[in-house]
Amino acid sequence: MLILTRRVGETLMIGDEVTVTVLGVKGNQVRIGVNAPKEVSVHREEIYQRIQAEKSADDLLIPKQRLVA
């Protein structure tokens, strides 16, 4: 894991098209802004895990159930 230190207003680059900017720090929370192309999904980890769990549950449905739902 790469560990970086940034101050408010500073940015880091991921590849050529994704930027992550530190917008603010308040207590133990950090506000960040992510600028990425539309085709790059950006989610908080807990949301990403929920999406993956829903996809897995959908894959377990038999085709007949998918048509009804």
From Swiss-Prot:
Keyword RNA-binding: yes
Gene behind the chain: csrA
Native source organism of the sequence: Serratia marcescens
Residue stretches spanning the membrane: none
This protein's record includes keyword Cytoplasm: yes
Major localization class: cytoplasm
Induction entry: Transcription peaks early in exponential phase, is greater at 37 than 30 degrees Celsius.
Family: Belongs to the CsrA/RsmA family.
Keywords: Activator, Cytoplasm, Repressor, RNA-binding, Translation regulation
Observed phenotype of the null mutant: Swarming motility initiates later than in wild-type; once initiatated the swarming velocity is normal.
InterPro entries listed in its UniProt record: CsrA, CsrA_sf
Record protein name field: Translational regulator CsrA
GO molecular function: mRNA 5'-UTR binding
